[in-house]
């Protein structure tokens, strides 16, 4: 019993000596937990607001209020939301709501800087950027963008190869086009129109 009392006294003395530390640690843990809950709640509120703004922008497009919808979509892009920022960029491009190519490229860079993007979503955005800048004929930049995709097992690998083949085919650089078309034919993907590839390969062969 005396030994038990002695141990209890030692514990109480240790607690008293480090009382401030234990209290500070407890307060710190509570603060961290509270901040976590607040950030989680704030993030959900922000995502809801972005979602509502995205829907509003689409409604405005249907009502032909293009300037207002463009402003909303560009604002969503700057929010760097992993879902709605890329979708907003795609709408800007598909609907031709922004004519300044430099701005579009800047928007691409903003979206590509989003940290929590899914890998395949990131690859799709890279492919779309390559397609966009191909209109200005920046060959080296296109290759730089797409090389990591075509040298991977990405679901966008075949689409990237086809785009590069079509890109060079359109400029009558048939040897380069053949290089990419040949890879596609060797892998026999289901999501690519192989008849079109074979037709172009025949044109290259007979050209």
Task: List the model feature ranges, each with a label.
Residues 61, 73-74, 89-92, 105-112, ...:
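Inward-facing hydrophobic residues that define packing positions of alpha-helical scaffold repeats
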């Amino acid at each position: 019993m005396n030994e038990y009392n002695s141990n209890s006294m030692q514990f109480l003395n240790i607690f008293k000596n480090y009382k401030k530390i234990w209290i500070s640690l407890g307060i710190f843990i509570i603060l961290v937990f509270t901040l976590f809950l607040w950030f989680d709640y704030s993030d959900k509120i922000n995502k809801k607001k972005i979602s509502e703004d995205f829907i509003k922008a689409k409604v405005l497009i249907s009502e032909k209020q293009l300037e207002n919808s463009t402003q909303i979509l560009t604002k969503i892009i700057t929010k760097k939301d992993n879902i709605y920022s890329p979708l907003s960029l795609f709408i800007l491009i598909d609907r031709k709501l922004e004519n300044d190519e430099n701005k579009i490229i800047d928007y691409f860079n903003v979206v590509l800087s989003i940290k929590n993007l899914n890998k395949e979503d990131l690859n799709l955005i890279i492919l779309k950027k390559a397609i966009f800048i191909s209109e200005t004929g920046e060959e080296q930049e296109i290759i730089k963008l797409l090389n990591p995709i075509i040298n991977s097992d990405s679901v966008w690998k075949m689409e990237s190869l086809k785009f590069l083949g079509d890109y060079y085919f359109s400029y009558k650089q048939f040897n380069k086009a053949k290089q990419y078309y040949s890879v596609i034919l060797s892998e026999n993907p289901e999501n690519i129109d192989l008849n079109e590839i074979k037709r172009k390969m025949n044109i290259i062969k007979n050209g």
